[in-house]
Amino acid sequence: MPLGLRGKKKAAKSKEAARLVEGERSSGSQGVPGPPAPARKLVFHAQLAHGSATGRVEDFSSISELYAKIAGVFEIAPSEILFCTLNTPKIDMGKLLGGQLGLEDFIFAHVKGTKKEVNVYKSEDSLGLTITDNGVGYAFIKRIKDGSTIDSVKTICVGDHIECINGENIVGWRHFEVAKKLKELKKEELFTLQLIEPKKAFEIGPRSKAGKTSTEKIGTSRGTLRLRSKGPATVEELPSEAKAKAIGKVDDLLELYMGIRDIDLATTMFEAGKDKSNPDEFAVALDETLGDFAFPDEFLFDVWGAISDMKQGR
């Protein structure tokens, strides 16, 4: 393990300040109390991004459960959903649904559209791609760098799901695994990508290359629904401006070092480090919660620096 103290086990549980709001029970009259009022449920409105009627989804605690609910409303298979955006049907990478959902957000589900196979000549070490994933097994392109190798291939677009690399099916891979695979492709060789683009409405517009910064606030109300892979969802306050800025810096570092963007991963890393007193304790906490990522030491020190800057008001 890198960093001196990683061998020492540290408790890695993040403190949760918020709990799931179940609703308020009506105050009973004097005497024998009546039956409790049913819990107030959170209900969200959703549409298919290429066009559909409006549906209602509720009773979900994770991304996979949400996709299943949306699929049920629109009578499609959950596997047809590539990703969701909030409050816009456009393929806007600044509006991606991740692990947090504003209590008044409108959900647009982007489903599978045209399949395409593209041959790419890797003329540079870096392809100029930033990868993210939808949390349930689909990695897709979040950003294309101007002037990069991929930018010259106009059939490759932001939002395209990467299904295969050189014939190898990568469905189920996490974003960092896909980014690593692409980075390891040999320079000055041809490789093949099998992609699935989101189904589009009949509209014409320029190809998007980059989303907005990850410090953008999520949701239009004061609270957010935090979706988790394990355990119940919780309703939380929006992060402070300083916290959002620090999380945004961590997300930028993920892109710089690993070629991915993941605001939920950045948030998890921030939560793991906010109450630690030194980088060694932080590294131990990350090993216990996110050991599969095998983050390099230089990256961890830079992330620790971003967290420390927030603590010191910088």
Swiss-Prot record:
UniProt keyword terms in alphabetical order = Cytoplasm
Q: How is this protein organized at the quaternary level? A: Probably interacts with SEMA5A.
Cross-referenced CDD domains: GH2_GIPC (cd21180), PDZ_GIPC2 (cd23078)
- Expression by tissue: Expressed in kidney and lung (at protein level).
Superkingdom to which the source organism belongs: Eukaryota
Which gene specifies this protein's sequence?
Gipc2
Q: Which GO terms describe its molecular function?
A: identical protein binding
Q: Give the compositionally biased regions (Basic residues).
A: 1-12
PDZ domain residues are: 117-197
| Protein source organism | Mus musculus
The primary site where this protein sits is: cytoplasm
Q: What is this protein called?
A: PDZ domain-containing protein GIPC2
Q: Where is the composition biased (Basic and acidic residues)?
A: 13-25
Region: Disordered, residue numbers: 1-36
The set of disulfide-linked cysteines is none
Q: What is one term from the GO cellular component aspect held by the record?
A: cytoplasm
Instruction: List, alphabetically, the Gene3D superfamilies matched.
Output: 2.30.42.10
Compartment annotation = Cytoplasm
Looking up Pfam families in the UniProt record yields: GIPC1_GH1 (PF25083), GIPC1_GH2 (PF25082), PDZ (PF00595)
Give the protein family.
Belongs to the GIPC family.
